[in-house]
């Protein structure tokens, strides 16, 4: 009887390190527990910088072989020629508000709770029963009409260009701007529905006809529609946040509604409109920084100033025409706390101060 065969020993290939594994390469800060590909604005990077800077790389930063994605018959990635404005370093822009995905939901949720609580308290206290019919007519016609302007800017201006900028920091700021406008338009719509349910004296559907047919609103509607036809994302941002919002938006919201509502026994509308004004103040903050960066650019600053002057020549006359067409609205309320002349003067003064802050000359059209 033959002896049983011994089991064969299994062999394993010898492990060889090729220095291709993670952590093999040694370089400055390679042993650090944290490493950043960018230089933060301050001593340490903020959460905003960690989640926005270099999230959208380009051939100027890290993509040494060019864009790795793009349409088959078009340019790759995010071309810089999507605007005629120039910058020696688009990545230098950082949103002073430090807005990113989390702050969009957190800040908007806080505003939504504020508006809901305001409307709920108004209905419980039956506030609308004490409002004069003239003031209800003013709200249904003009505040309702402004809702269409906000909605148009949200959907067809800011949403349309939120992926057109050359850096993630610019695109994130514009996306937050779109969220602000969209939420404010929805707040005005909710306010309109609440009033329509609370009192029979309020017509909740007339705002559409006012926006489409009322002569005082047609120049404003025309400007909003002309804005949606602009293909240059930087011009669209400039014309909207720097020109239109100053000469028309703030004129209506801040210099009219916020001034006269309380005198007409209304403390609800200023609360809601005030959220839109607060949003615009934040949006203006990033817009001011962006255009100041472009006008002070060491290589393209003078060319950008000339370009922005051309844009002012296009949009200032249109927005002034829209502003002056709104003049009859100032005589509508029962208690006329302010005049159109004083409101327009205040809006022009703020606009002039803004232009000085971004190193631009005051256009001649502003004094005509």
From Swiss-Prot:
CDD domains registered for this protein in UniProt: AAMH_B
Query: What GO molecular functions are on record for this protein?
Result: oxidoreductase activity, acting on paired donors, with incorporation or reduction of molecular oxygen, NAD(P)H as one donor, and incorporation of one atom of oxygen
Note whether NAD occurs among the keywords. yes
In short, the EC number is: 1.14.13.227
- Which InterPro entries does UniProt cross-reference here? Ferritin-like_SF, MP_mOase_hydro, Phenol_Hydrox, RNR-like
A Pfam family annotated for this chain is Phenol_Hydrox
The keyword NAD belongs to this UniProt entry's keyword annotation: yes
Task: Please list the reactions this protein catalyses.
Answer: propane + NADH + O2 + H(+) = propan-2-ol + NAD(+) + H2O; acetone + NADH + O2 + H(+) = hydroxyacetone + NAD(+) + H2O; butan-2-one + NADH + O2 + H(+) = 1-hydroxy-2-butanone + NAD(+) + H2O; phenol + NADH + O2 + H(+) = hydroquinone + NAD(+) + H2O
Keywords, alphabetical: Monooxygenase, NAD, Oxidoreductase
This entry's comment on induction and repression of expression is: By acetone. Transcriptionally activated by MimR.
Tell me the subunit arrangement: The propane 2-monooxygenase multicomponent enzyme system is composed of an electron transfer component and a monooxygenase component interacting with the effector protein MimD. The electron transfer component is composed of a reductase (MimB), and the monooxygenase component is formed by a large subunit (MimA) and a small subunit (MimC). Requires the presence of the chaperonin-like protein MimG to ensure a productive folding, resulting of a soluble MimC, which leads to the active form of MimABCD.
Family, according to the entry, reads as follows: Belongs to the TmoE/XamoE family.
| Function noted in UniProt | Component of the propane 2-monooxygenase multicomponent enzyme system which is involved in the degradation of propane via the O2-dependent hydroxylation of propane. Also involved in the degradation of acetone via the O2-dependent hydroxylation of acetone. Also able to catalyze the oxidation of phenol, methylethylketone (2-butanone), 1-propanol and 2-propanol.
UniProt protein name: Propane 2-monooxygenase, hydroxylase component small subunit
Tell me the organism. Mycolicibacterium goodii
């Amino acid at each position: 009887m033959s002896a049983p065969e011994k089991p064969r020993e299994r062999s394993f290939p010898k492990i060889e390190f090729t220095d291709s594994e993670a952590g093999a390469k040694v370089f400055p800060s390679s042993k650090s527990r944290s490493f950043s590909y960018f230089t933060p604005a301050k001593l340490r990077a903020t959460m905003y910088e960690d989640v926005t800077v270099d999230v959208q790389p380009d051939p100027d930063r890290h993509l040494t072989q060019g864009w790795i994605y793009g349409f088959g018959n078009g340019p790759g990635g995010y071309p810089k020629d999507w605007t005629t404005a120039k910058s020696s370093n688009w990545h230098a822009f950082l949103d002073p508000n430090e807005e990113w995905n989390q702050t969009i939901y957190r800040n908007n949720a806080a505003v939504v709770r504020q508006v809901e609580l305001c409307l709920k308290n108004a209905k419980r206290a039956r506030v609308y029963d004490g409002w004069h019919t003239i003031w209800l007519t003013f709200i249904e016609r003009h505040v309702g009409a402004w809702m269409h302007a906000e909605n148009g800017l949200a959907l067809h201006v800011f949403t349309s260009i939120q992926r057109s900028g050359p850096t993630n920091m610019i695109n994130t700021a514009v996306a937050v701007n779109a969220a602000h406008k969209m939420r404010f338009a929805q707040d005005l719509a909710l306010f309109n529905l609440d009033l329509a349910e609370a009192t029979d004296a309020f017509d909740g559907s007339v705002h559409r006809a006012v926006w489409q047919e009322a002569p005082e609103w047609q120049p404003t509607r025309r400007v909003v529609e002309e804005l949606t036809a602009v293909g240059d994302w930087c011009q669209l941002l400039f014309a909207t946040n720097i020109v239109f919002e100053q000469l028309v938006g703030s004129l209506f919201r801040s210099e009219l509604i916020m001034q006269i509502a309380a005198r007409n026994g209304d403390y609800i509308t200023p609360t809601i409109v005030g959220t839109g004004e607060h949003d615009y103040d934040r949006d203006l903050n990033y817009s001011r920084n962006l255009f100041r960066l472009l006008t002070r650019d060491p290589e393209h600053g003078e060319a950008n100033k000339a370009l922005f002057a051309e844009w002012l020549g296009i949009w200032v006359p249109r927005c002034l025409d829209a502003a002056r067409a709104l003049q009859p609205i100032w005589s509508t309320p029962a208690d006329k706390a302010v005049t159109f002349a004083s409101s327009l003067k205040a809006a022009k003064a703020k606009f002039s101060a803004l232009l000085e802050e971004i190193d631009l000359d005051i256009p001649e059209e502003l004094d005509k």
